[in-house]
Amino acid sequence: MFDTVIEMLSYPFMTRAFLVGSLVALCSALLGVSLVLKRYSMIGDGLSHVGFGAMAIAAAMNAAPLTIAIPVVIVAAILLLLISGNAKIKGDAAIALISTTSLAVGVMVISLTTGMNTDVYNYMFGSILAMSAEDVKLSLVLSVFVLILFIVFYHKIFAITFDETFARATGVKAGVYNTLIAVLTAVTIVLGMRMMGALLISSLIIFPALTSMRVCRTFKSVIINAAVISVVCLIAGVTLSYVAATPAGASVVLANLVMMVLYTVVGAVKNHMR
C-alpha cells in the first residue's frame, strides 16, 4: 500500500490531481452546505452544463478553457439568481432553462467543429490527466480566494442560509451575499470540471453536505464534517481511479456514496440509542 502511494506521488499529474482536487473538494463542501440548506443544490448541475458549453467553445477557438469558462459561468450564476427572483419562474425551472440551453450550445459547437475528441470527453466525464501546470496555478489561486472569502463572510452566509428574511430585517444585504455564494460556486464548479467532469461535478456539492447532516446537528459541525468527508472521498476516489484505471469523477462519486451509507447507518444507530 505504501509503495502504491509513493508510486502515485512520483507522477506530476497525480500530485496535481491530489492538490487541486482537494482544494476544489474543500470549496465545494463549504458552499454545498449553504446551497443544500437553501434548497438550491442543483445550481451545481446547471452551472456545470454551462461550463461544458463554454469549454466546448474554448476548444473550438483553441483558447485556454478556464479563461473562457470562468467568466461565462459566473455570468450564468448571476443570471440564474435574477431569473429565479422572478415570481413567474421558479429556481428549479430557471436552472433547467439555462443548463439545457448551454448543453445544447456545447453539443452544437462540438458537432460543427472538433467532434467528440479526447478533450471534450474529459470535460464531460473527467480525467486525472486533464490538469495542466497552468491549470494548477490558476486553480490554486482561485481556490484560496474562494476559501478566504467564505471564511471572511462566514457569519453573513450563516445568516442568509437559515433565515434570509430575518437577515434582511437586521440589515444584512442578502442579495449581495446570495450573489457571492453563486459566484464562488461558479468558480468552484469550473475548477473541478477538468477532473470530475461536467456530468458529475455537482456531486461534490451535494454528497458531503447531505452525508454530514446524517450525524451532525449544528451548522459549524456540518461544515467541518462535510469538508473532511469531501477531501477524504476525493483522495480515496482519485486513488481508486489510479489503481483500477477508472474515471476519476465516477470513482469519487462512489467513494462519496459509500461514506454516505456509513454515516446514515451511524446516524440511525445514534438516534436509536437516544
Predicted regions and their residues:
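Generic alpha-helical transmembrane segments of integral inner-membrane proteins
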Residues: S22, L26-L30, P71-L79, V105, ...
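Transmembrane alpha-helical segments in multi-pass inner-membrane proteins
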Residues: I201-A250
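Short loop segments and helix-boundary regions at transmembrane helix junctions
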Residues: V33-M116, S212-I224, S241-A244, G267-V269
